[in-house]
């Protein structure tokens, strides 16, 4: 299990106190403390709450996963985050238009995969891979929450989702599980493959891209958004993965380092068709009222991925690290005398 990270403000400090058994969630009052919904403090607090449903943390009681007071606290963090996301996206219920927009690749893009393919340095590639490990070492897990929420009798959507997930989990071969292939790439780059090793240095935009998956996946209410977010990944990943293969080759790294991205160039090109023709179409055939939620899932994840891309490229273009430097001093939690 990963170790608990350092706090990034009063809210995350308070959640860490709860997880460490130093106080009860029922004692927390967040009034006036939830400020920037995209900031480090709220995003880490949410990440901590969500991680209890995955691997949790060393020394944290398993019973806290379903502690009603901690779940209520999480809900008070989710509200401002989701409201802020929805305020920044166009909305609507035209799924076809949202998907078609994903299929348009710019001739001259500016995101991190473009940067790394053209001029990226080895240290920047390492940072990218390290930061993305927060998702890729549990790749496909957030989307697995939606499986029991899809119709299994008229199972077109469920069958297509399971086909893709089956591939993500190695199609029965442990060494081909995508999280395992990602860890192999990290090892080839000399990075720490421990689950959660880079949480302390992951800035808020990284946490937000993972948190939105967990938020949508853990709420049946947002099953349509979870499917939309999953569609975004499968439709848009092949071109970016191809550029990352180019970046690895340009840097003179051995072919095995690029295997993860090479796998996604091929596999996700097939997955794109499954997602469009069966998963999305099958879901909306049974539950057409979820169209707006599917669009939200696509738009929300696009927004947060763009925020992350802006952060990475801005830092790298300025000759700076994109990693976050943890605070030297402990943060005062909500409700403490120093808060």
Predicted region positions:
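Non-heme di-metal
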Residues: 1-335
């Amino acid at each position: 299990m990963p170790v608990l990270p350092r706090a990034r403000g009063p809210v995350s400090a308070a959640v860490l106190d709860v997880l460490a058994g130093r106080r009860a969630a029922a004692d927390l009052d967040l009034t006036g403390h939830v400020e920037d919904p995209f900031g480090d403090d709220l995003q880490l607090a949410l990440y901590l709450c969500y991680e209890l449903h995955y691997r949790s943390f060393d020394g944290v009681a398993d019973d806290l996963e379903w502690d009603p007071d901690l779940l209520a606290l999480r809900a008070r963090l989710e509200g401002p985050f989701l409201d802020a996301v929805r305020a920044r996206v166009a909305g609507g219920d035209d799924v076809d238009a949202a998907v078609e927009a994903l299929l348009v690749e710019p001739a001259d893009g500016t995101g991190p995969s473009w940067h790394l393919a053209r001029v990226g340095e080895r240290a920047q590639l390492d940072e990218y891979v390290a930061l993305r490990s927060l998702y890729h070492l549990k790749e496909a897990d957030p989307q697995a929450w939606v499986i029991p929420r899809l119709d299994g009798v008229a199972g077109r959507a469920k069958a297509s989702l399971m086909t893709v997930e089956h591939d993500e989990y190695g199609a029965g071969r442990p060494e081909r599980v995508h999280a395992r292939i990602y860890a192999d790439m990290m090892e080839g780059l000399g990075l720490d493959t421990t689950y959660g090793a880079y949480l302390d240095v992951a800035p808020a935009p990284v946490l937000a891209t993972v948190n939105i998956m967990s938020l949508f996946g853990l709420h049946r209410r947002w099953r349509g958004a979870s499917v939309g977010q999953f569609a975004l990944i499968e439709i848009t990943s092949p071109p970016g993965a191809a550029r990352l293969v180019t970046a690895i080759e340009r840097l003179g790294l051995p072919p095995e380092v690029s295997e993860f991205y090479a796998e996604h160039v091929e596999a996700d090109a097939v997955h794109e068709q499954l997602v469009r023709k069966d998963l999305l179409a099958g879901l909306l055939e049974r539950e057409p009222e979820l169209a707006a939620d599917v669009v939200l899932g696509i738009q929300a994840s696009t927004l947060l991925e763009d925020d992350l891309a802006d952060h990475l490229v801005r830092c790298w273009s300025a000759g700076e690290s994109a990693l976050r430097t943890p605070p030297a001093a402990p943060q005062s939690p909500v409700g403490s005398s120093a808060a």
